[in-house]
Amino acid sequence: MQCYTELLSPSGVTHALAIPFLSASAENLVVVKTSVLQIFSLLKVQHHSRGETIETKSARPDQVETTKLVLEREYPLSGTVVDICRVKILNSKSGGEALLLAFRNAKLSLVEWDPERHGISTISIHYYERDDLTRSPWVPDLSSCGSILSVDPSSRCAVFNFGIRNLAILPFHQPGDDLAMDDYEFHLHQDDLNQVSDHVGNGLKSKDSTVYQTPYASSFVLPLTALDPSILHPVSLAFLYEYREPTFGILYSQIATSHALLSERKDSIFYTVFTLDLEQRASTTLLSVPKLPSDLFKVVALPPPVGGALLIGSNELVHVDQAGKTNAVGVNEFARQVSAFSMVDQSDLALRLEGCVVEHISDSTGDLLLVLSSGNMVLVHFQLDGRSVSGISLRPLPTQAGGTIMKSAASSSAFLGSGRVFFGSEDADSVLLSWSSMPNPKKSRPRMSNVAEDREEASDDSQSEEDAYEDDLYTAEPETPALGRRPSAETTGVGAYIFQTLDRLPNIGPLRDITLGKPASTVENTGRLIKNACSELELVAAQGSGRNGGLVLMKREIEPDVTASFDAQSVQEVWTAVVALGSGAPLVLDEQQINQEYRQYVILSKPETPDKETSEVFIADTQDLKPFRAPEFNPNNDVTIEIGTLSCKKRVVQVLRNEVRSYDIDLGLAQIYPVWDEDTSDERMAVSASLADPYIAILRDDSTLMILQADDSGDLDEVELNEAARAGKWRSCCLYWDKAEFFSSTGPALKQGTRCELFLFLLSIDCRLYVYRLPDQQLISVIEGIDCLPPILSTELPKRSTTREVLSEAVIADLGESWNPSPHLILRTESDDLVIYKAFASYIKGESHTRLSFVKESNHTLPRVTTSEKEMQSNEKLSRPRSLRILPNISNFSAVFMPGRPASFILKTAKSCPHVFRLRGEFVRSLSIFDLASPSLDTGFIYVDSKDVLRICRFPSETLFDYTWALRKISIGEQVDHLAYATSSETYVLGTSHSADFKLPDDDELHPDWRNEGLVISFLPELRQCSLKVVSPRTWTVIDSYSLGPDEYVMAVKNMDLEVSENTHERRNMIVVGTAFARGEDIPSRGCIYVFEVIKVVPDPEKPETDRKLKLIGKELVKGAVTALSQIGGQGFLIAAQGQKCMVRGLKEDGSLLPVAFMDMQCYVNVLKELKGTGMCIMGDAVKGLWFAGYSEEPYKMSLFGKDQGYLEVVAAEFLPDGDKLFILVADSDCNLHVLQYDPEDPKSSNGDRLLARSKFHMGHFATTMTLLPRTMVSSEKAMANPDSMEIDSQTISQQVLITSQSGSVGIVTSVPEESYRRLSALQSQLANSLEHPCGLNPRAYRAVESDGTAGRGMLDGNLLYQWLDMGQHRKMEIAARVGAHEWEIKADLEAIGAEGLGYL
């Protein structure tokens, strides 16, 4: 009984689409990452020359406008998206267009944006999984077939090609439809396969007053052979522009294309254009172009002014216009060999078009940008004679013009207008690019002009002259014009673009290998002061492809860079205050102004009794603290509630329990203002305070509110409150500066000429949120039922509920990067749960202003349970409440900090949702912002922990906070295929590869004709050139390298504790490398086993980290490729998969590897692992399934224990021991996870010969590695465990399996006890039935795997279970009651199946 939980969501972009989604005028980008849907808005910001970025509305004249991506919403989907398209429907809720998504297994989902919910709303879900369509024995399964989705540019219909030859057609209603209502009624026709959501309402009305119940009509399915009997092998299709009726072009062949049979099946592709008659469900053939090159694989519809379609092949581009006229260009020398089709010769470009992505970048010239699989960019230009295309020309984009911005292949693209284009990638970061035209003084007219008169009047002589200038634009010597190329005036656009990066979506996929290593200390000679601020181990993975290859460091918690540490005995609170020494506070600070015009105070509070404390004042001098004498600062030793600055940093304000003290810039006393009630003279004490210049909001112990305001001189005076605020009883108060004018747009309008940026948020005792505008104290909004924690908070009255959460605090704060913070409501419960709401404005019909609402953000971070009486006593020793701390600028982030254990930051980037990151270390008593006083360093923070250590820190450099873990990417510049940590030298050894041209060997005596290869072919094939590299974790740079031969490939790199002497039995840590010599499929492959030691050498004086080097200890050439390695047994031997054998070998003193035992295998062993120290190992065959064997040392022998019966295509595998049971996890090539068990006592296992299939689970991601890791006890288990019981030992040795994937996702499989499994299984069933799932998908069907019914109890879906935390309090308790469990039990179970078991990371 196991549970699969996704720790990191996929990061590689698979699909991208530009669409006005949020409104009719919105600029949105919809991105799909395998099974995650993200909706971005394009925000124009101002970028300063020094790197500073701010919003456009506050721009300064010396800044340049740029565009950034801002995430609106993110949805995990219970399905794998295969395509997306935009559809313009009638009367959408937002006024924008709708989104049509195609999923694996023939599903379509139509969604729109709902402004009232600030999220997507599913209009319909369409299933095409019908038996009569897929039951043919010679038709592959739907999951094995590709799917193509295309929508007519006028949104009249969509076509969905699935199951090879099935075509589903989904019509959409549009204004002016003349379709008969009888043919499109709401009742489902017998041929209709739609399952409609409840989005019916009062119907949709078009301009001709025809009322439709849904935005679409009944869909129908046709076989492609109904369009034309010759369409037997469809390749690609796309709807075309500029047709009155829905018209699409399709590439197909009558016989299967084959490179091996090229001589017989040359030019076998057809391109045909069909027009659809939706009313008659018929089609008409408009044109057909036969005998096209057989390597064509994609149809790209081109908008005006070019029109027609571009057909992309491996070696050529073919344009077909509306009349069937073709223009083609060959881009390498193979184009004329594989096809007899007439084409222009540009073979000197030597391009490989396989896997390329093309996107148009100019509406005026029709130019295209083509991204190759290597990441290089090529401009495609069409020569136009009026509306007719006379030729195609290509020009590689040079590096200085941005041609190498993409480091690897693109997977998708989207043209965003205004000179912007987006390229998504699964192998590198996705990029948002802008382009500008390069000025050319030789030309008299604008480069991007598209005036028809200029085209017609230009002479051939002038055009040829301009082409000569274009040839000199990027190259040093003139190029020979391509054969058959007709010069045109439009050729002036070729190569006239410069591209630059506007924004990036970080990607860590594909994750190729993973290892654990010890982190290098970031600060030397600090001893114990930094010991607790660093994890025991760090997770390092090999990521990326091609030039984008590198490493990624994964941190479960934030490990700050500590710049200074101090002993701080008995310090409980730390405060900072920055005062301005000059006349004012300039907006932009240079290095001298930071040091001369500002002074930073650090105040440490040490309690003496619960009601008394002493304050120590320091001045921050760079990274040192110098004592400062301030006799007037808190002389009465009162308890400090808050410290801040007012009057443009001219006054320091200290809010004490009994009074408010105001100081000048030298901390001389300026004013004392009492906290008691002046009307009744009752003694009152402050319990919390909020500062926002020039106001101070103070909440007193009788739940009453007091507001002070500073005048121009800095003196404080009490603000007279209105009746409601004065008489109310409040739980929490918060002042908020609305710099983005978000709340100013909600509520009643201000008088003309006035401006308001300050708002007061009050949480009442009965949990109502009041929003007041200052200084007029106008009530803007009242939101009830805050403690019900519903998904949407608005002014509408909530449903009555008897189940409510006990709230302790509520703050409104900005979250996000400094250039684009957004307001969020953060609620803290009594049990330290954090609930995060994002503010948004929803429009109200009939009113001029918008309504303030909040939408709940996902937060699956659970608070830790106090584990021991000692810890409880240490926490209770200080009875003061520790409030949330708002951090307006910390390392260029607006964040919120929660002290305690664990201490947590709430962080958000522009491209992510808010995430709760825990701070590594002990119980944090207090934290405050600390200005590091250096222009090269970001604003940091200072905190004190329970070990009486005061640290000055900053966020780790080059760290990404876009995901639930903190990530740091390190570029290597080559693809990293394998990775190992050398424990003896504390370095990482990488197996890398890069592309290199392959040349036949000149010294081959059997093939003397190979010596003339250069005369026959210049377009050489590319193969991988491999090498080994040593990386130091101190600087993350390559310090040594070992190159391999041109035909030798690294297949495995492992760190092993090997016996190096058969006489002394000495053992040392070695790096063992397995390689394969592959020289073609007609030559048997060989292999080699290398044994290296990373030794210490004399370093370069300027590079002290270069003190390590690879030393070759042993080398053994073997028959067959060495495809997998592992250590085995207890004598320091290794086992290697070489060819079709698995052989155990021992290292001798002469460097040879002596075989001692072996086992015959069958095909290709790609997985070989031992359950450490037991001799039991698994061998995964890529074709023949999984073998479970054992190795004995006396005598040396390999024995087969069991084998799976399903002949799984093993991609990755790992052991998972669970008590006295042994499970084996296997990931196959269809993204499924199989759980096998070795149980010889079960009769079905035939005495253990068969591995029993216990369950199957669809992960949705192609697994790359599985790693068995020890599991630490989580806080709930520690709290429930008896310290005197021996059960603690049995729990601490439990293990779990970490799974990485090609999409960049990281998952974990955890064994679940029987009691917890029953509880979580019932909860999963309730959630699957009661939740509203995005796009109308079924999570149960997504995770299920079709089988013969032999599988046992299913694996739990941790991502679905965690959605219980996102529900409102009433629904949460209702479902818990149905399950028959308490809230704390479910939370303990959820904590156990997450990342908390990785306590050492």
Curated annotation (Swiss-Prot):
The keyword Nucleus applies. One of its GO terms (molecular function) is RNA binding. Keywords: mRNA processing, Nucleus, RNA-binding. Disulfide bonds: none annotated. InterPro entries: Beta-prop_RSE1/DDB1/CPSF1_1st, Cleavage/polyA-sp_fac_asu_C, RSE1/DDB1/CFT1/CPSF1, WD40/YVTN_repeat-like_dom_sf. Residues 454-474 have a biased composition (Acidic residues). Pfam families: Beta-prop_RSE1_1st, CPSF_A. GO terms for cellular component: mRNA cleavage and polyadenylation specificity factor complex; nucleus. Its main location: nucleus. Residues 434-489 are annotated as: Disordered. Transmembrane segments: none annotated. GO terms for biological process: mRNA processing. It is found in: Nucleus. Belongs to the CFT1 family. RNA-binding component of the cleavage and polyadenylation factor (CPF) complex, which plays a key role in polyadenylation-dependent pre-mRNA 3'-end formation and cooperates with cleavage factors including the CFIA complex and NAB4/CFIB. Involved in poly(A) site recognition. May be involved in coupling transcription termination and mRNA 3'-end formation. This is Protein cft1. The gene is cft1.
